[in-house]
Amino acid sequence: MPSLRDIRNRIGSVRSTRQITKAMKMVSAAKLRRAQDAVLKTRPYAVLLDQTLSRLAARAAAEEQVAHPLLAPRAQRTAEVVVVTSDRGLAGGFNSNICRFVQRFLTENADRFERIALSTVGKKGREYFKARRLEIRKDYTGVHANLAYEKAEALAREATERYLAGEVDAVFLAYNEFKSAISQKQVVVQLLPIDTSAAGADATGIDFKYEPSREALLAELLPRHVAMQVWRALLESAASEHGARMSAMESATKNAEEMIASLSLQYNRARQAYVTKELMEIVGGAEALK
């Protein structure tokens, strides 16, 4: 049975842990509010840009005037999956969920592609796939620190350059889509080539006018569309990470409080037993002196 001192030390240790988890929960809650605002502001623009460009591209394809390599279909032998994870842990199943989701995607598409490589955004994804000896083509570090659109633009530009150079025939983007503070959805979207199949029917009945030209418009907007999809994925992942960490720290804080209550009860019982034993010894000594 542990001594009173051991129990007191354990209570003090758990209280210190509770203070840390409570502080981390508050920090994550503040970051979540900012990240959630950024996601809600970005989503409408990203969705509208996606719809508009998909319709433009679908119309061009319908008229057999595809003039941009990001739209041109080709045989898909090699693929790349860009996986967005976090640099830090203590976020519940945030990182493990998306990593396992990507592993299932790789298994399900093993027959579709001759070779699938990975690019990781975040230390946790790199560590996960490196431990499983999977090919990591590119590791992006420092993206989550001071998250900015320029970083998403650079990442999208590098992926586009690899695609245009013929190093890969398809690029996919995997990330946690933010639903709520306690809910995230793992998704994999095709980044390149840009998929216009969903907008084909809607675009045929629309009369588009292009200034200065269709080719110039697509050349300007398609790379921006790819960058915006990457930017949205980074924002969605950041909000999901903060929400997952806030929930994990809230759960850890509650567990610490329950443990403190249990240890306090154990301490009081041990102290009561110790006092009772002392009284019995005093009474026994007094009886012996009679």
From Swiss-Prot:
Where is it found, in Gene Ontology cellular component terms? Answer: plasma membrane; proton-transporting ATP synthase complex
User: Does the record's keyword annotation contain Cell membrane?
Assistant: yes
From the UniProt record, which GO molecular function terms apply? Answer: ATP binding; proton-transporting ATP synthase activity, rotational mechanism
**Source superkingdom:** Bacteria
Q: Which UniProt keywords apply?
A: ATP synthesis, Cell inner membrane, Cell membrane, CF(1), Hydrogen ion transport, Ion transport, Membrane, Transport
Q: Does the keyword Coiled coil apply?
A: no
Q: Which PROSITE patterns does the annotation name?
A: ATPASE_GAMMA
User: What GO terms in the biological process aspect are recorded for it?
Assistant: proton motive force-driven plasma membrane ATP synthesis
Identify its membrane topology class: Peripheral membrane protein
Q: Where in the cell does this protein reside?
A: Cell inner membrane
CDD domains, A to Z: F1-ATPase_gamma
Q: Which Pfam families match?
A: ATP-synt (PF00231)
Query: Where does it mainly reside?
Result: membrane
| Described function | Produces ATP from ADP in the presence of a proton gradient across the membrane. The gamma chain is believed to be important in regulating ATPase activity and the flow of protons through the CF(0) complex.
In terms of NCBIfam families, this protein maps to:
ATPsyn_F1gamma
Subunit (UniProt): F-type ATPases have 2 components, CF(1) - the catalytic core - and CF(0) - the membrane proton channel. CF(1) has five subunits: alpha(3), beta(3), gamma(1), delta(1), epsilon(1). CF(0) has three main subunits: a, b and c.
What does the similarity note say? Answer: Belongs to the ATPase gamma chain family.
Q: What is this protein called?
A: ATP synthase gamma chain
Q: Which organism is it from?
A: Anaeromyxobacter sp. (strain K)
Q: What is the lineage of its organism?
A: Bacteria, Pseudomonadati, Myxococcota, Myxococcia, Myxococcales
